[in-house]
Design a protein with these regions (language model features):
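N-terminal signal peptide c-region/cleavage motif recognized by signal peptidases
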Residues: 19-21
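Extracytoplasmic small-molecule ligand-binding "clamshell" domains
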Residues: 29-105
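Periplasmic-binding protein-like
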Residues: 43, 126-134, 200, 208-247, ...
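Bilobed "Venus flytrap"/periplasmic-binding protein-like clamshell domains
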Residues: 44-47, 57-74, 110, 128-181, ...
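Extended ligand-binding regions for polar small-molecule ligands
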Residues: 63-71, 144, 149-150, 155-157, ...
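A ligand-binding cleft/hinge motif common to bilobed small-molecule-binding domains
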Residues: 92, 106-117, 162-167, 187-190, ...
């Protein structure tokens, strides 16, 4: 069912495609010439972007990007586009995008004011909240509850940035940065740390994949709002317009609901659609994330 806001977003995305400056169409021209697109994907950002047991890159974000590829095919009037997948980590995703190694980043990347200086973002496709994963015997209801705890951080993430800013002020804790979410989660499970702050959806995905939901707590305390979006190169207006159009179409038609249920309502994991996520479908937007309790952007 088409909402008024989704209809307007779709019309805007359609209009953007026909008002593009020539210099902004480089990636679309490359795709037309090579008939290939490279998607930047994650190894273990379940359920958004991960490698399954069959060694395939799958997930909610991956499906959204594949939907965008179909839209690109229609725009370029191509019968087929070869899709290549390239694994990226948190610290690598922006450098690899800017270097041209990937064309779209299809993971769990938060749209932030700082990142907007380097890249462009699509419409929001999910809104997470930063929370804290702990063993069952640790309860986190305020930042002060983290004082004195050894804490794991994942490199190149908004949680690393936020907790680094908090350290030495409101937060007095031992921070250890790990290469990725999987390593930080492993440190928690092995007892090397007692807390792991990260987006709640990713924490639940890690715990569900490990069949450890009953042994862990995800804090009621939410430290930030984390709107996820597809990343493209800064100024790549032609490609961004088509990605936005593909998202606006499935939001307006309601197809997004079935896609959401496919990845967030499974035997292993159930994540109810939050109000902010639903609002992003009915009122497509590109609002940046914010550390809501601390009063600054992330």
């Amino acid at each position: 069912m088409f909402t008024a806001h989704a209809r307007v977003a779709l019309m805007a995305a359609l209009a953007a495609v026909v008002t593009l400056p020539a210099h902004a169409a480089d990636t679309m021209a490359k795709i037309r010439e090579t008939r290939t697109i490279v998607l930047g994907v994650r190894e273990a950002a379940r359920p958004f972007s991960f490698v399954n047991a069959q060694k395939q890159s799958v997930g909610y974000s991956v499906d959204l990007c594949l939907n965008a590829v179909d839209e690109i095919k229609r725009e370029l009037k191509l019968s087929d586009i070869k899709v290549q997948y390239k694994l990226v980590t948190g610290p690598e995703r922006i450098p690899k995008l800017l270097a041209g190694e990937i064309d779209l980043e299809c993971g769990s990347t938060t749209n932030t004011m700082a990142r907007q200086e380097k890249v462009d973002f699509s419409y929001t496709f999910f809104v997470a909240a930063m929370r804290v994963l702990t063993p069952k015997d640790v309860q986190i209801e305020a930042v002060k509850d983290l004082n004195g705890l050894p804490i794991a951080l994942s490199k190149g993430t908004t949680s690393e940035k936020l907790f680094t800013q908090l350290a030495g002020g409101e937060l007095q804790a031992q921070l250890t940065t790990y290469a990725n979410n999987g390593e930080a989660y492993k440190a928690l499970r092995e007892g090397k740390v007692r807390a792991f702050p990260q987006d709640d959806s990713l924490l639940l995905g890690l715990a569900a994949g490990d069949k450890a939901l009953d042994a862990l707590n995800v804090s009621s305390l939410a430290l930030s709002v984390e709107p996820y979006a597809v990343m493209v190169r800064k100024g790549d207006t032609a490609l961004l317009a088509v990605v936005d159009r593909s998202l606006a179409r499935i939001y307006a038609s309601g197809e997004i609901n079935a896609l959401y249920d496919k990845w967030f309502k499974t035997d292993a994991l159930t994540i109810k659609m939050g109000r902010l996520t639903r609002d992003s479908f009915t009122r497509p937007n590109k609002q940046a994330g914010v550390a809501m309790l601390l009063g600054y952007s992330i």
